[in-house]
Amino acid sequence: MTKPNADSLMKIGQLKKPYGIKGWLWVFSETEEREAIFSYSPWWMKTATGFKPLTVTQWRRQGTGIVAQFEQVPDRNVAETMNGVSIWIDKDSLPSTEEDEYYWSDLVGLSVINKQDECLGTVKELFETGAHPIMKVVPSQDSIDDEPRMIPWHKQTVDVVDLAAGRMVVDWERDF
């Protein structure tokens, strides 16, 4: 298997603590539907020495979560060293998005400009809250101030997303 280009990868999950004695691990999925993570392959794990393949041999629902066994993890001793390892896939293996739909990874790094043409910062991450996703916007060199912001990812807040220009326009005052 050829090594992936790190720039073409997208994080889709993370390995958590071991489950049982046979090397199974809890899997935290960042996909919209939790179990959809298993429909993508190949998986890559990010290590200190670069990206290495991670092959799922079997998986199942366990309580409110999911657990999986991997070819590279033969027993619990190895599994204990895997807690926190991130799971990545090649972006090219993802289906195309519809108009006005975006993968969160495409939004990270965009400049956030309000309707008053003030730069509020850069999108650092998005996370789900239950009601709607939230963008964590951190100060950038061009920001109007040094304040981090939490801005809802919602059609009433986000007016324009221009991936080619690397920016989005939001209806969000600087002092919210």
UniProtKB/Swiss-Prot annotation:
Designated gene of the protein: rimM
Pfam family, one: PRC_RimM
GO cellular component terms listed in the entry, alphabetical order: cytoplasm; ribosome
Protein name, entry field: Ribosome maturation factor RimM
Family: Belongs to the RimM family.
Subunit structure and binding partners: Binds ribosomal protein uS19.
PANTHER family in UniProt: RIBOSOME MATURATION FACTOR RIMM
HAMAP family assigned: Ribosome_mat_RimM (MF_00014)
General function of this protein: An accessory protein needed during the final step in the assembly of 30S ribosomal subunit, possibly for assembly of the head region. Essential for efficient processing of 16S rRNA. May be needed both before and after RbfA during the maturation of 16S rRNA. It has affinity for free ribosomal 30S subunits but not for 70S ribosomes.
InterPro entries: PRC_barrel-like_sf (IPR011033), PRC_RimM (IPR056792), RimM (IPR011961), RimM_N (IPR002676), RimM_N_sf (IPR036976), Transl_B-barrel_sf (IPR009000)
Domain characteristics, as noted in the entry: The PRC barrel domain binds ribosomal protein uS19.
GO BP: ribosomal small subunit biogenesis; rRNA processing
PRC barrel domain: residues covered: 99-176
Subcellular location, record wording: Cytoplasm
Domain of life: Bacteria
Keyword Transport among UniProt keywords: no
Key words of the record: Chaperone, Cytoplasm, Ribosome biogenesis, rRNA processing
Organism of origin: Psychrobacter sp. (strain PRwf-1)
